[in-house]
Amino acid sequence: MSDIALTVSMLSLVAVLGLWIGNWRIYGVGLGIGGVLFGGIIVGHFAQRYQLDLNSDMLHFIQEFGLILFVYSIGIQVGPGFFSSLRVSGLRLNAFAVLMVLISGLITAAIHKLFAVPLPIILGIFSGAVTNTPALGAGQQILTDLGSNPSQIDLMGMGYAMAYPFGICGILLVIWLIRLLFRINIDAEARDFDSRNGHSHELLQTMNIMVRNPNLSGLSIQEVPILNSDTIVCSRLKRGDFLMVPLPTTQIESGDLLHLVGQKQELENARLVIGEQVDTSLSTRGTELQVSRVVVTNERVLGKKIRDLNLKQRYDVVISRLNRAGVELVAGNNATLQFGDILNLVGRPQAIDAVAAIVGNAQQKLQQVQMLPVFIGIGLGVLLGSVPLFIPGFPAALKLGLAGGPLVVALILGRIGSIGKLYWFMPPSANLALRELGIVLFLAVVGLKSGGNFIDTLLNGEGVTWIGYGILITAIPLLTAALLARLMIKMNYLTLCGMLAGAMTDPPALAFANGLHATSGAAALSYATVYPLAMFLRIMSPQLLALLFWSV
């Protein structure tokens, strides 16, 4: 069997064994995707014992490409809501991430000085304890630049392997302990996130208001500023027994009933200006109007603003809501359409059919993946990650690397949505498949590489001591941040899990956190919010530690 065929076979074995281990449940908690790492350690141990020759270049490529696939798909998933989340809670989340990085760095420095642990080994333990492979590479590079002995630099990998397993398990354990300690109800936390954090757009409300302000009588909809804004949509107007879709030029009369859609505060402002709230139903039942949901799939309308389609004047149809990546937005005139947007239409059946034909509404297109944008995004991400950042006093340039670059690019492209005929929308099933494939490949290779000398170092060397150091570097920052976040500011549990995973730059922990609730995107959103800064700080930390203690 060729070395390539053998390598693929071993990776498949690792994936099967690891996923099986990940499905084991102890008190309802399992390793999930993190089980692949331990499957890799087991297979790696026996591979070395029986002297199986695996292709190292192929393993290196698979490890890096798997990580790229994972972080890219995460970025595309959370991109549409990332920047709004950053405005709402990004400062607070990133403050906790910085706190965790700072504490882990201080503990590492203390262990190095108090126990005289060689610098290459403690930097390897640090990288493994915070589950950051790019930090390992950055540490090895700066030690090389500083003239360290190559044999000592190789010890970094062993320290990394000793600390990495608990780095993976430690965050899962903390997530589990916080859940038990505070008696967390996952469904309640998901609902709380939807109502309070970033998804407040989802809870768009409606209000029926009767026109009582005499100053509005005779004015058209577009002449009333509160009704001609991007924060409120007037989707129906009832005059007597007649229900209609109001046009911008439709004149308002005293006694008219307006059905408005928007956020609560905006609706209250409209009520103060227009008149009084009434409980009268403005349902389309029994009328010639109907409400339908259509999806944007026509490439010709991508990037166009709602006002450019002129649907009210041409078809007497109004878009009352716009759902993008699970977040409901007010369909203001300046809202730009993206592939996969779901539009809530109100109008006559024939007119709605005509509008549906314009925007596409081709459900089968939602299951198709444009591969060209995927590889454009990955390529741009790798280029960004390779750009060196020179800082005075640093002998080596800092880089976002193959994990940070693709994530940042994916966040931006996910937010943009489309450029011309290229769209970065990815069906949830395809996104999940890429994400899971990527993390399985990454962990399988890390496990295989760590497994060879893992048992020997654990039993006959200083492995147990190194693991103890790693536990301190892993557990203390996690517990400190988790308890402070939950006790001081009552942080949502799912958001907390994503923040911890992001601050540890730990994809398996994110996969575990995502699995806590089937539909909530809270963990992924907070992960992506803190990940770019955390990744930068994690890469910079071993370089700072090396510079501080090299000549001391």
Swiss-Prot record:
Listed SUPFAM superfamilies: TrkA C-terminal domain-like
Cellular location(s): Cell membrane
UniProt entry keywords in alphabetical sequence: Cell membrane, Membrane, Repeat, Transmembrane, Transmembrane helix, Transport
Keyword Protein biosynthesis: no
PANTHER family named in the record: K(+)_H(+) ANTIPORTER SUBUNIT KHTT, TRANSPORT PROTEIN YIDE-RELATED
HAMAP family: YidE
Stated name of the protein: Putative transport protein NT01EI_3867
Native source organism of the sequence: Edwardsiella ictaluri (strain 93-146)
